[in-house]
Regions:
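Gram-positive cell-envelope targeting signals
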Residues: 1-33, 220-221
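Bacterial extracytoplasmic/cell-wall-associated proteins, especially those involved in peptidoglycan
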Residues: 30-222
């Protein structure tokens, strides 16, 4: 066999070995992420690499980064808590699950035109940075939505106030940043998540409601 053909055959074999080995490497990497996450405290998780937090939320690293940048740009900053940022992230997750919304993935929901002020309508990109606070807010939002600690009907917010909102909306929360509202919905998803929900029993969250950073962790926002 000519030398060129031998080299070509060897290169092809090496490429095939690399391709076949990628799933095993990825699985080993994700297993390491899972061990890191499960064996850590929240204070340790807060400072973990972005890719580990993304894995914990079931997102690709690129989607998680985009999500964190939107949360950073849309959510209010506070030295005391990350409540506003968590509720922005939870609003996105609630929209993904509500059957009334046309998008099912986080990235599609974030890039839907006209939904988020910090996302460009034409390019679907954002120029905001991200912080440890905004990354952690996403982690906590996933946790709270899964545990039904935040009303699944919370799918709207703005920074201007409750005045002028549609009559379909129910005032839900204000923490000094955004005004969050509930939307009456009887879709299959919302009904299954909160079967006993009654709009007449909905009340504003108290002013002292707060979602704190892990013990010993100070503010990290841009």
């Amino acid at each position: 066999m000519p030398l060129f053909k031998k080299l070509l055959s060897l290169m092809t074999t090496l490429v095939m070995i690399m391709i076949m080995g990628q799933p095993a490497l990825a699985n080993a990497r994700f297993e390491r992420f899972e061990l890191m996450w499960n064996d850590a405290t929240d204070a340790e998780r807060y400072f973990m690499p972005t890719e580990v937090k993304a894995y914990a939320c079931g997102l690709s690293t690129s989607d998680f980064i985009f999500f964190a940048r939107v949360v950073e740009g849309e959510g209010g900053d506070s030295d005391e808590n990350i409540t506003d940022k968590v509720f922005v992230a939870a609003t996105v997750l609630n929209r993904c699950m509500c059957s009334r919304w046309p998008t099912r993935s986080v990235i599609a929901t974030l890039q839907r035109p006209g939904q988020f002020e910090v996302v460009d309508r034409e390019t679907h990109q954002t120029h905001c940075g991200r912080s440890l606070d905004s990354e952690w807010a996403i982690v906590i939002a996933y946790r709270m939505v899964e545990n039904k600690e935040i009303d699944c009907h919370m799918v709207y917010y703005n920074a201007y106030g409750f005045t002028g909102y549609s009559r379909q909306f129910i005032n839900y929360a204000y923490f000094g940043g955004n005004y969050f509202s509930l939307l009456t919905c009887q879709c299959a998803s919302c009904t299954s998540r909160m079967p006993d929900w009654d709009e007449d029993e909905c009340e504003m969250l108290p002013d002292d409601y707060a979602i704190l950073r892990p013990d010993g962790v100070g503010p990290h926002y841009i």
